[in-house]
């Protein structure tokens, strides 16, 4: 294997592909990146068994001799990042010993034989649909934060993707809050899958420009085609809970308020709240709306929500300040609407007269 390549082109590809590498993998070979130098380009592959990423570089490269090797992800990435010059020369000089040279640097890096690297099926099989990459990225950013951090219910550690009747619905919940974003799609297909949070996190870092991405959904995996990148991820087994009642029950009491004003009030009210629970209380009536918090050790604070408009019977409700702030940022509109049913029932947060992004927060019992 012998080639010259633009350093920044290689660095960008290695940075993205290395997102699939786990340095704690029980298989030492999977702590590396596989280099396959073919006649028409360089193929880079990495995997941790749960997610695999592959890309092909065919620009900014001069191929001198084809071949393959597996190089440590940690070291090859740091070498290419810190080495000088615009062009890098990489050559396997003895067995798997790989020499990386630039204008003033020479590194000899021990590699591994490429046939020890597991074979990864990146064939484009399964149900197919396409969408704009920025739409996909937006959906993930508006739902991913609501996934569970607890492994006791693995299905809640991912995002539920449902497609039916030309509609994509993405749902995430940790049982204390819920995020649901929907959008129309052109493809006439049906599926209901759960994609791991980790995989989605890696995918949104690969998306850099607005282009069409293709998804191929199978029973146990889904393949993303993003430009020159192929991302294969396993799916989470299990049935995602039915959350339709939470988003259908809009509530008869509503409050509309400027998003920035409420975020500011939440930030100030949570200054004196308990650091662990971060609970605040919202007291509402048609005449006055107050956000407050209390800590026996620290003190108390009250915020008068002068820009809020409330319709309904007087009500007091307590909840996590962080959860509501996350929901408001996800909605992203200038004005939001909060919809309530009862004091201890989940309440909704939406944009005003918009229902393509529905956030739900569960109240808590407090002082």
Predicted regions and their residues:
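Structural preference for solvent-exposed beta-strand-turn elements
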Residues: 1-367
């Amino acid at each position: 294997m012998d080639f010259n390549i633009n350093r920044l082109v290689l660095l960008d590809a290695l940075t993205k592909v290395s997102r699939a590498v786990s340095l704690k993998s029980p298989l030492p070979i999977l702590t590396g990146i596989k280099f396959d130098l073919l006649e028409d380009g360089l193929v880079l592959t990495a995997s941790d068994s749960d997610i695999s990423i592959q890309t092909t570089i065919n620009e900014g490269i001069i191929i001198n001799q084809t071949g393959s090797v597996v190089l440590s992800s940690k070291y090859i990435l740091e070498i290419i990042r810190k080495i000088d010059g615009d062009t890098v020369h990489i050559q396997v000089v003895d067995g798997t010993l790989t020499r990386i040279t630039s204008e003033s640097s020479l590194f000899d890096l021990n590699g591994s034989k490429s046939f020890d690297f597991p074979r990864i099926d990146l064939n484009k099989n399964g149900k197919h649909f396409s969408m704009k990459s920025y739409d996909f990225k937006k959906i993930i950013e508006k739902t991913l934060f609501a996934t569970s951090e607890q492994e006791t219910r693995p299905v809640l550690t991912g995002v539920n993707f449902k497609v039916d009747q030309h509609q994509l619905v993405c749902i995430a919940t940790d049982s204390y809050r819920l995020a649901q974003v929907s959008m129309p799609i052109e493809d006439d297909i049906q599926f209901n899958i759960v994609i791991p949070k980790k995989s989605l996190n890696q995918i949104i870092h690969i998306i850099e420009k607005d282009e069409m991405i293709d998804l191929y959904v199978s029973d146990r995996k889904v393949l993303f085609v993003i430009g020159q990148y192929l991302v294969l991820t396993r799916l989470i087994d299990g049935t995602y809970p039915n959350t339709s009642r939470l988003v259908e029950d809009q509530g008869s009491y509503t409050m509309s308020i400027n998003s920035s004003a409420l975020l500011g009030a939440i930030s100030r009210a949570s200054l004196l709240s308990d650091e662990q629970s971060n609970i605040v209380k919202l007291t509402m009536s048609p005449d006055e709306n107050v956000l407050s918090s209390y800590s026996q050790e620290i003190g108390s604070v009250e915020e008068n929500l002068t820009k809020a408009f409330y319709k309904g019977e007087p009500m007091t409700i307590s909840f996590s300040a962080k959860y509501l702030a996350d929901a408001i940022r996800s909605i992203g509109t200038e004005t939001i609407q909060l919809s309530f049913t009862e004091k201890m029932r989940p309440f909704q947060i939406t944009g005003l007269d918009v229902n393509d992004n529905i956030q739900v927060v569960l109240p808590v019992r407090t002082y």
